[in-house]
């Protein structure tokens, strides 16, 4: 598995490619994503364990979307059952669920690290304020920096797991190796991902104008763009 470092402009091309893949079968995309969001809502509202369960099966569901997108891109069909293909695959189900547990563990770890940093930095800022006789701008600035670091860490974890899912399902990679490769791919392609994020933000504003109806197109195009980024960055 080779990981490419692509040009920043690829971030725009991913959405163009996502639009192309979406146009191959718009109805199938909409049906698949409606089922996806219904599953997410139903699972997440289960008391006590719902959100934990969704975090664990989430990578498998996302990987199933990648499999369906690849089938469609290669001349096959995109079907609703593709969404569950990772969970129904006897060989890949276990590794995908392990990947979900890794994701859950990383999220908890980052959140704990953020809390500890906030506590320690807050204590240091308080001590500085006591010594200098005033709080000034130090305490809010510390909070902003810690929040920014926490947000960036969460984004990196999310992006790495987003790539790790298809690496496990489509390439047969083991979960920990897939996470390692996913993180490396994200770090190698920060600029195109930032460009893609900027494109998404602009499109999100446009999609929200007509009573949010534009999201019926933007949501599947964004998922298809995610597949396009995977195809662009990874090669066998």
Give the label of every model feature segment.
Residues 1-236:
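Hydrophobic alpha-helical membrane segments
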């Amino acid at each position: 598995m080779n990981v490419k470092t692509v040009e920043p402009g690829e971030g725009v091309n991913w959405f163009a490619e996502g639009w192309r893949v979406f146009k191959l079968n718009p109805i199938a995309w909409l049906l698949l994503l409606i089922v996806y969001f219904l599953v997410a809502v139903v699972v997440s509202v289960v008391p006590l364990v719902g959100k934990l369960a969704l975090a664990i099966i989430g990578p498998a569901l996302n990987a199933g979307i990648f499999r369906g997108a690849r089938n469609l891109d290669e001349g096959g069909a995109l079907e609703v059952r593709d969404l569950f293909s990772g969970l129904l695959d006897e060989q890949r189900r276990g590794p995908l669920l392990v990947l979900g547990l890794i994701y859950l563990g990383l999220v908890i770890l980052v959140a704990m690290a953020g809390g500890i940093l906030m506590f320690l930095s807050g204590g240091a800022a308080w001590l500085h304020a006591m010594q200098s006789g005033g709080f000034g701008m130090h305490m809010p600035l510390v909070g902003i920096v810690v929040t920014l670091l926490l947000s960036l860490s969460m984004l990196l974890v999310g992006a790495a797991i987003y790539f790790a899912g298809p690496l496990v399902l489509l390439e047969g990679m083991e979960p920990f190796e897939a996470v390692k490769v996913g993180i490396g791919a994200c770090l190698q392609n920060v600029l195109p991902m930032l460009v893609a994020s900027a494109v998404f933000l602009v499109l999100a504003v446009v999609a929200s104008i007509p009573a949010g109806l534009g999201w019926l197109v933007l949501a599947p195009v964004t998922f298809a763009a995610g597949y396009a980024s995977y195809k662009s960055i990874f090669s066998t």
